[in-house]
């Protein structure tokens, strides 16, 4: 469980997510009970060029559960959407890859994270990355905006995951790619005692699904070539692990 202090409580899972990740944005030096920062990203296979190009401030609030960039190349000139972008580490990497002629939209429900992501992108020299506060279920972007949608440890935090995937499908262009890292639940391990409260929802525990369930939801949303690409070993509880998923919008 997180080490978020006692004022980080709420009866609503979404509000609990906002409170916890505001705390992470404002106090990244605190111990939250799960791995974060540059060394965690290195463990997950992030390229050394990216790790060195971005300052420690960009990485300090990054709680990556996997490496979505390992699932396929992001090309120069493309448009990428990062849902649940947090402090913007992945969005900054995407901005590196798409270059000045590309575009990156970072979406997060936490105003403190959006502000920090904007500061990080500006300080890193990525004007092509812009950030907006919004819910994953109501992305403020037109149909067919993106060549790729990435996400890292965020979709499990949504209560209505079907609605999230429908929105992702909507904003992708035909042939667009979904490349995500997220937390999943091991079906063979019983739930931890901590897994029933909203705090563990914000800690990427209670909202997790089994991999097969999530794959079925991707197919239901209309995606093809749906694939569980592997597990990352990231843990938020004894019965969860990071996983990598990819899929294509047909067309």
Residue ranges and their predicted role:
Residues 186-205:
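Short, glycine-/aromatic-enriched active-site segment of Class I SAM-dependent methyltransferases
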Residues 110-112:
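Conserved SAM/SAH-binding beta-strand->alpha-helix loop
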Residues 1-44:
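N-terminal auxiliary segments of SAM/dcSAM-dependent transferases
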Residues 162-177:
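A short glycine-rich, Lys/Arg-flanked "PGG" loop and its adjoining helix->strand segment in the class I
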Residues 76, 137-148:
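A short acidic, Gly/Pro-enriched loop at the edge of an enzyme's catalytic core
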Residues 206-221:
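Short alpha-helix
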Residues 34-79, 93, 97:
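Conserved alpha-helix/loop element of class I SAM-dependent methyltransferases that forms part
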Residues 124-138:
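Conserved SAM-binding strand-loop segment of SAM-dependent methyltransferases
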């Amino acid at each position: 469980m997180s080490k978020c202090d006692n004022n980080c409580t709420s009866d609503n899972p979404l509000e609990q997510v906002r409170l916890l990740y505001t705390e992470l944005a404002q106090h990244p030096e605190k111990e939250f009970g799960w791995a974060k920062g540059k060394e965690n990203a290195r463990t997950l296979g992030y390229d050394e060029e990216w790790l060195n190009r971005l300052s420690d401030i960009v990485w300090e609030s990054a709680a990556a559960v996997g490496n979505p960039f390992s699932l396929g190349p992001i090309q120069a000139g493309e448009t990428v959407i990062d849902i649940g972008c947090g402090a913007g580490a992945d969005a900054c990497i995407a901005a590196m890859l798409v270059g000045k002629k590309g575009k990156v939209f970072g979406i997060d429900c936490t105003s403190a994270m959006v502000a920090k992501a904007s500061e990080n992108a500006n300080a890193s020299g990525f004007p092509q990355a812009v950030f907006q506060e919004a819910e994953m279920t109501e992305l403020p972007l037109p149909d067919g905006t993106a060549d790729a949608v990435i996400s890292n440890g965020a979709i499990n935090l949504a209560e209505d995951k079907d609605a999230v995937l429908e929105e992702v499908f909507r904003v992708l262009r035909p042939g667009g790619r979904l490349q995500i890292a997220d937390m999943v639940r091991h079906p063979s391990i019983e739930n931890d005692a901590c897994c029933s409260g909203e705090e563990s929802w914000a800690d990427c525990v209670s909202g997790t699904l089994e991999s097969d369930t999530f794959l079925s939801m991707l197919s239901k949303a209309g995606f093809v070539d749906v694939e569980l690409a592997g597990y990352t070993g990231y843990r938020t509880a004894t019965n969860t692990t990071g996983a990598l998923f990819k899929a294509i919008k047909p067309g």
